[in-house]
Every structure is written in C-alpha cells, then in structure tokens.
Amino acid sequence: MRLWKAVVVTLAFVSTDVGVTTAIYAFSHLDRSLLEDIRHFNIFDSVLDLWAACLYRSCLLLGATIGVAKNSALGPRRLRASWLVITLVCLFVGIYAMAKLLLFSEVRRPIRDPWFWALFVWTYISLAASFLLWGLLATVRPDAEALEPGNEGFHGEGGAPAEQASGATLQKLLSYTKPDVAFLVAASFFLIVAALGETFLPYYTGRAIDSIVIQKSMDQFTTAVVVVCLLAIGSSLAAGIRGGIFTLVFARLNIRLRNCLFRSLVSQETSFFDENRTGDLISRLTSDTTMVSDLVSQNINIFLRNTVKVTGVVVFMFSLSWQLSLVTFMGFPIIMMVSNIYGKYYKRLSKEVQSALARASTTAEETISAMKTVRSFANEEEEAEVFLRKLQQVYKLNRKEAAAYMSYVWGSGLTLLVVQVSILYYGGHLVISGQMSSGNLIAFIIYEFVLGDCMESVGSVYSGLMQGVGAAEKVFEFIDRQPTMVHDGSLAPDHLEGRVDFENVTFTYRTRPHTQVLQNVSFSLSPGKVTALVGPSGSGKSSCVNILENFYPLQGGRVLLDGKPIGAYDHKYLHRVISLVSQEPVLFARSITDNISYGLPTVPFEMVVEAAQKANAHGFIMELQDGYSTETGEKGAQLSGGQKQRVAMARALVRNPPVLILDEATSALDAESEYLIQQAIHGNLQRHTVLIIAHRLSTVERAHLIVVLDKGRVVQQGTHQQLLAQGGLYAKLVQRQMLGLEHPLDYTASHKEPPSNTEHKA
C-alpha cells in the first residue's frame, strides 16, 4: 500500500478508537470525574484501566505511523521485525479484558451495565484492528527518495524473494488429493462420529458418578454405563475406519507426488542435471515425498479429529460455567503464540535438515557408485570420515530441533499448569459462593483436561505440519519448475536423408557462462559418408555431439538436419533417427534384449539378434547362461567394458538410424572386434550418416572427411591425405601418434570440457 493511504487509515482509526473509548468511559462514570476515579480507583468497579489500555495502543500505532512516515524504506522493516511486540500487547490487553469481566461479575451479578459491555466488545474490536493496521504499515512501499543511495533507509541489497506461504503450500498439497474426494468425505464422516462419541464420554461418565454419589440409583448407573460402552465401541470403530481411509488416501498422494516429481525431473533441460547433484534429486524423490505424505497425513488426521472434539468440549464447558471457560481461554492464546513461533523456527530447521541429509546422501551415492575407484586408492576410511562429517552436520541441526522442542513443551506445559491451577482455585471459589455445583466443577475439570490434551495435540500437529510443509516446498520447487529448453518440435517426416549442417555455431555451457566452448563452428555431414572429428582434449568435439543431440541451446548459429533446425523435429523422432554410442555407455539393470530395444515400443527379437550380430555381440551373448535374457546388472556391471560397448552399439544399430554418432565407441574393443564393427559400418554407408570421434589413426584415416578442432574453432577440413599434405595441427597429431610420443590424435589442452551427459544415450 502507498504511504499516504496507510497513514490516513491509521490516523482515522486512532482518532475513532480514542473517541469511542473516551465516550463510553464518560457515560459509564457520570457520577464521578476522571480525577476522582484515578484517586479512588477500584479494579472491581472501574473501567479506567481499559481506557488507559486504549491510550497505550493508540500511542504505539501513532509511533509506528510516524516512524514509517519519516522513513518509508526502513520503517516497515522495523515494524515487521517487531511484530512480536504488538502481538504481546494485544494478547495481554485481551487477557486482561477477560479478567476484568470476571472481576466485574464478582460485584455485579449479573452484569447489566450496557456501557461496560460496549467497552468490553469495543476493546476486542480495536485490538484486532490495531494488529491489522500494524501489518498494514509494515507493507508500505518506500518512496523513490527513500531508496536513493546515502539515505538512512537505503541498504543497497535487493530483497530476497519471499518464501511461498505455508498455507498456500498446504493448500496446494491438498489439491493433489482431489481424485480422492469421495474417500476424504467418508473419512471426515467417520472422523466426526468418532470425535463426537469421545466428546460425550466424559459427560456420561459424570452422569454415572452422579447416579452413585447423589441419586444412589442402580438403574440410572446401569443406563449410563451402557451408554458409555456404546459410545466407546462406536467411536473406536469409527476411528479405525477413519484411520484406514486416511492412510489409503495419503498413500495415493505419495504415489501421485512421486510420479509428478519424476515426470518433472525427466522433462528438465540437460543443464539442470549439470547444476544439481544426483543425490539431492534422489533425496527429493524419496525421503522428502515420504516425509510430506507421512507427516501431513498423520497431522491433518489429528488436527481434524481434535478440532471436532474441541468444538464439542467448548460447548459443554460454557454450558457448565462461562466464568471458568474464560479462565481457560486466557491461557490458550499464549500457547497458540508459542506454537506459532516454534512452528516457524521448526519449519526453517526442517528445511535445513533436509538439505543436510541430501548432501549426506549425495556423498554416499557418489562413493557407493564408484566403489571400485575408492577401493583402488584404498580410500574407504577417508570416504567414511567425509560421510560422518556430513552426518554430524545433520546431528547439529537435530540438536537444535531437540532444544526447540524442549523449550516449546516446557512453555506450553507451564502455561497449561497455570491454567489448571487457576481453574481449581477459582472453581472452588464459585462452588463455595454457590455459583456452581461440585458435580459441574468435576465435569468441567474433566473437560478441561480433554481440551488441554487436544490443544497439546494441535500444537504438536503445527510443528509436524511445518516440517511437512518445509519438505513440500522443496518438492514443489522441482514439480513447478519449467524447463528452460522445451522440446516442442513437431516435424516427423517419413523419409530422412540424414544431411547435417553446422552453421556458425557458438556455444557456452550454462555452468561456465564466460567460456565459449565453440566459436563460429561450421561443417557438414553428408549421407553415406563418414566424418571424423579430431582435436586436442577440450577442443569441443563432445560438445558438437551434445548439440547435435539437441541437449543444449545454442548461443549463436544453428544446426540443420535435412535443412531444418533440429529443434523443429519431434523429440522422440529426432532421437530415433540420430543414435549415439558413447565412450562409456550406460546399460540399465535389465535383460540384454531390453537394453538393445531400449526406447523402442516394439522390436521383433529377430531385429535384436541382427543388430547384435552387426555389433559383434551375438557370440558372447550366446555364451552367457541365459543368453539374451541375461540381466546386465546396475549400469551393466555384470559385463566387461568391451561387452558393454558392443551391446550399446547394437542398441544404436537396431534403430537403423539415418545419423549414427560414435564417440570413442570402439575404445574398449580388441582389434578384431573393432575391425568387424568398422566393416559393418562401412558396409552399410548408404543407410547412415556417420560422425566419429576417435583418437586411433586406423579409425580416422578411413573417414571421407576429417574436421580438426582446436580451442572451439575449426582449423582444418579434408581427407587424411589432404590434411597430411597441408601440414598443420592434424599432421602434428598423426606424427606424434606414429612416434608414440603421445596418446592417439590427442594432447593435453589448456582447458577441459565438462563431463558429457551423452553417456545417458545409447
């Protein structure tokens, strides 16, 4: 809200509050002046203290208004930081007004003074308005002058994005239960039945005691006991059905959340997985979704049950004694405020705990997935120490949670104890003065204990809900995330020649925005031809593959497939006509048949066998115990490196792709297997456009076109003989290889490319 509007509204209310309160006070004390009332103040008969409370809250609002008006940038911040002050003031005045009503009832039975009732009601109206106006002033937008550098309220930093409100997150979470509305209605019905049955139990228990102590009637006692038994049985059955339905509903919610989260994750752009650790994503998908469904289901169940019980208990309590009911409710606002403070703190701690657990999970996942490497360096103890340090960070946060919970239980328990002692003392006074019977006092005390248990449960529910909401915010952060690179192409022609053109391609990884990996790169891949990319490490060879696979967006230029931008093609179609075999292919924990036919809806077994034969994999597959039904293990761990490459080659060839990319695809093969695969590729060139990234001279020299990259630029193009004749970088690389001075067609460059994500492809 603008500053002048907030100031006008606040000043208008302060004037109204002081005027109305003063008028009511004056009409209620026509028989004496203000000075006389001050000199002879009687707390049992005067409302001077309520008038003074009005002046105090008006001064607070005026001070807040002046502070915001003088500095519209810093003032609202200070008000937001001091919300606890106005909360305590309103809470104290509200409790004092209740106590004032009880004191008046001691000398005026009943209270018939309309001016007292008018001031009593107006006090609560003005307290609510004061609290709201404080919040209104805290949301004032600063003027332009207040934001100028050098101003008192100018801090120079941008405000952090506001966190999504807990209520909105909870509402969004519950919206995922819409398909289960019928189940929720049934569960709510049985919840109400069970809660009402539990609410009537103390009443009929008191009736049973009265029939023995007062009426001394066995018939009335038997009737009361039968009713108690029926209520207990009925409420127990209803509670069991309610719990079962809620458990079913939130189990379905858990499945729904995980499915939505997983679908959102697999739709993200490739850069997203470069920036986020696998352990963090797995933690969101497993522990966070489980925590959300478990905590929210359990706590919503408890909250609804206790809400219904509280409603019934409050009705019975007011019917027994309105005075003791006011005494009871004096303490509960304090408990609610403590619960609110604790809940916010616990929510923040919960998010920190989940993040710390995710970091620990990432460490464990990284170590276990690379156990052979860890063992080869005898680094087991060091990895265990790293994991222990991560767990110790979690433990430190757990200690904070324990301390916060201890303080919360201590504060709420002490408040409940004060309320119970006050009820006993004041209730005894009412019984002695004849305003209440002893039986009603006993019944009221029973209901007060029930109410206390309900409020304690609601308090624990709040902290549990905040913990669940904290996890839900992390889950929704990924569910709601829109990928920055959308695969919305629609082209899917029946015939594709397979011509690929790189036109002035400039590319930068999002994780390294200031380093251009490719700079104005241009070359073409022709149908029926083999093109080889060579160059030093970090020259951009694998980046060209990533771009051709449409993994990343370009910063400049374009890549064309048959004259059309690759982004214009349908996502599934594009990766059916372009197949990739990487240096370290990833197999899935499935059978060899399923791995070869991965990503294809239906593939005849004969085509699987034919592709395996072309990839020189059929022989070793048939030697396995289960043949093509053999499970490859996690990431193909049951197969050797060469066997995995041949299965990955078969996975690419079974698609009969117009464009075939081999990124060091034969590096783990023996010479004979490599020769057979090369023969299969060169023998079927009329159906493939082949791009090879290789370091072996035997693989490169047979290519129809060799493209030499250096530092992200194309420095040479031609056949093997042409490039040797030209001299230059390619000739140096060949010479070094032939002399054995360096690894084949490669040397260490000044920079390295980030790990390629192409291992997720065939």
Curated annotation (Swiss-Prot):
Ranges where the ABC transmembrane type-1 domain occurs: 184-467
Q: Where is this site: Intramolecular salt bridge with Asp-17. Essential for the release from the ER?
A: 57
Site residues by UniProt (Intramolecular salt bridge with Arg-57. Essential for the release from the ER): 17
What's the stated role of this polypeptide?
A: ATP-dependent low-affinity peptide transporter which translocates a broad spectrum of peptides from the cytosol to the lysosomal lumen for degradation. Displays a broad peptide length specificity from 6-mer up to at least 59-mer peptides with an optimum of 23-mers. Binds and transports smaller and larger peptides with the same affinity. Favors positively charged, aromatic or hydrophobic residues in the N- and C-terminal positions whereas negatively charged residues as well as asparagine and methionine are not favored.
The UniProt family comment states:
Belongs to the ABC transporter superfamily. ABCB family. MHC peptide exporter (TC 3.A.1.209) subfamily.
Q: What is the designated name of this protein?
A: ABC-type oligopeptide transporter ABCB9
Gene encoding the protein: Abcb9
Query: What are the recorded Gene Ontology BP terms?
Result: peptide metabolic process; peptide transport; protein transport
Is the keyword Translocase in the record? yes
SUPFAM superfamilies the UniProt entry points to:
ABC transporter transmembrane region (SSF90123), P-loop containing nucleoside triphosphate hydrolases (SSF52540)
| Subunit and interaction comment | Homodimer. Interacts (via TMD0 region) with LAMP1; this interaction strongly stabilizes ABCB9 and protects ABCB9 against lysosomal degradation. Interacts (via TMD0 region) with LAMP2 (isoform LAMP-2B). Interacts (via TMD0) with YIF1B; this interaction allows (but is not essential) the ER-to-Golgi trafficking and strongly depends on a salt bridge within TMD0.
Its UniProt entry gives the catalysed reaction(s) as: a [oligopeptide](in) + ATP + H2O = a [oligopeptide](out) + ADP + phosphate + H(+)
Share the domain note from the entry. Answer: Divided into an N-terminal domain (TMD0) comprising four transmembrane helices and the following core domain (coreABCB9). TMD0 is required for lysosomal localization and LAMP1, LAMP2 and YIF1B interaction. The core domain is required for homodimerization and peptide transport activity.
Keyword Protein transport included in the entry's annotation: yes
Q: Tell me the Gene3D superfamilies matching this sequence.
A: ABC transporter type 1, transmembrane domain (1.20.1560.10), P-loop containing nucleotide triphosphate hydrolases (3.40.50.300)
Membrane-traversing stretches: 7-27, 47-67, 84-104, 116-136, 181-201, 221-241, 315-335, 412-432
What is its subcellular localisation?
Answer: Lysosome membrane
> What organism is listed for this UniProt entry?
Mus musculus
According to the entry, every stretch annotated as the ABC transporter domain falls at 500-736
Q: Which UniProt keywords apply?
A: ATP-binding, Lysosome, Membrane, Nucleotide-binding, Peptide transport, Protein transport, Translocase, Transmembrane, Transmembrane helix, Transport
